Amino acid sequence: MSDTAERVKKIVVEHLGVDADKVTEGASFIDDLGADSLDTVELVMAFEEEFGVEIPDDAAETILTVGDAVKFIDKASA
């Protein structure tokens, strides 16, 4: 798992209170990890703060899984 993926996983575990084993790249924030719409907004804000990237609303709507977040952050940080 990449450094970005590890950091995303840590944020998800802290914000959603889920078991780290459930936070896989294919895990859906809503369907698999039990996030609601407010949780997803808070996660996006946490990702922006942690990685120093801006995630526009239209992009945030496409970040549905842990892997989506990692890919977006890696691309935005490049």
UniProtKB/Swiss-Prot annotation:
Keywords assigned: Cytoplasm, Fatty acid biosynthesis, Fatty acid metabolism, Lipid biosynthesis, Lipid metabolism, Phosphopantetheine, Phosphoprotein
Origin superkingdom: Bacteria
SMART domains given in the database record: PKS_PP
Localization terms from the record: Cytoplasm
Post-translational modification: 4'-phosphopantetheine is transferred from CoA to a specific serine of apo-ACP by AcpS. This modification is essential for activity because fatty acids are bound in thioester linkage to the sulfhydryl of the prosthetic group.
Modified residues (O-(pantetheine 4'-phosphoryl)serine): S37
Entries under PROSITE patterns matching the protein: CARRIER (PS50075), PHOSPHOPANTETHEINE (PS00012)
Protein name: Acyl carrier protein
